[in-house]
Amino acid sequence: MNLDEMTKVGMADLKVGKSPDVLTTLGLGSCVGVAIYDPVTKISGLLHCMLPDSTQFRNNSNKAKYADSGIDELVAQMLKLGASKVRLVAKIAGGAQMFAMNTNNDTLRVGERNVAAVKMKLSELNIRLLSEDCGLNYGRTVEFYSETGEYVIKSVGKPR
């Protein structure tokens, strides 16, 4: 399938779809791509979140920018399409540390914090995390297939 036939999810964005839709997001560095799926209805959602916590910012109107509010919004849109909350499962990718930092300053460890926030929100919503490809120091591009629930991760700059 070529990129023109896929639904593109931008940075700080989310999209929902259903079979046979394919959702894709490019350039996940410290950001996290959160794919949520209902295997019975084949309703899917993909979030490209940039930051862990919307409560730390005054201007937080873009819910998709943050892990906490983005996952809530993604699930809400999927339920409106007919997904069942009890069947939802998730797969995640991203959360890299793209630049070498010799510090213990948590503020600079955005990738790790994003992954932790995503996992916490999924757990809070009782959405089972099936798989993850997170961390390290390379980017990722993902494709999420609504027909099968397959989450294809393409690594960018991954050491061999």
Residue map of PLM features:
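Acidic, glycine-rich active-site loops and adjacent beta-strand->loop/helix elements
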Residues: M50-T55, G94-M98, G135-N137
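General beta-strand structural signal in soluble alpha/beta enzymes
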Residues: V9, K18, T24, L46, ...
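Conserved mixed alpha/beta catalytic, RNA-binding, or beta-rich assembly cores of soluble enzyme
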Residues: T24-L81
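Short glycine-rich phosphate-binding loop at a beta-alpha junction
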Residues: V86-G94
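Divalent-metal-activated hydrolytic enzyme cores
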Residues: T107-R160
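Short, basic and Ser/Thr-rich N-terminal targeting/leader segments
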Residues: G10, L28-S30, Y138
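Phosphate-centric recognition/catalysis
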Residues: M1, E5-T24, V40
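Phosphate/ribose-phosphate-bearing ligand recognition and processing surfaces
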Residues: Q97-G111
